[in-house]
Amino acid sequence: MVTDQSPNNNGWPERYFAVIFTAQRSQSGDDIYDITTDRMVLLARRQPGFLGVELVRGDDGIGITVSYWVDRDAISNWRQQAEHMAAQALGRQEFYDWYRVRVAEVVAERAFIASNIVDAVHGTGDE
């Protein structure tokens, strides 16, 4: 798993957005998939409004990437970034049997750290 975030996201805004990309890898494109993924993470980190990313993939080829952004404008700008658009097209042609993208607003966060609970709730706590 690759992650850019600290357990309690010091310095992140009270509310932010998550882009959840869930995908099933196809049997082709292995030689360039990792290179493309690494490049996209590097580019995303350079985008204004980017906060962090988490990536995980199971042995069954299903992966989940969650990227975090300050607002929907930052997400839209990332979606329209030229090299990212080319990678999206390559993903449809070579890398994935299917994928789903969801965008969610994060209004609360809780984390477990070594036996302490960090409660970074920004809403009511009733979520």
Residues of each region from the PLM?
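Short arginine-rich
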Residues: A89-G91, F95-D97
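Residues that form generic nucleotide/phosphate-binding pockets
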Residues: I20, A87-L90
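Short S/T/G/P-rich N-terminal loop/turn motif that feeds into the first structured element of a domain
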Residues: M1-I62, R72-Q80, Y96-E127
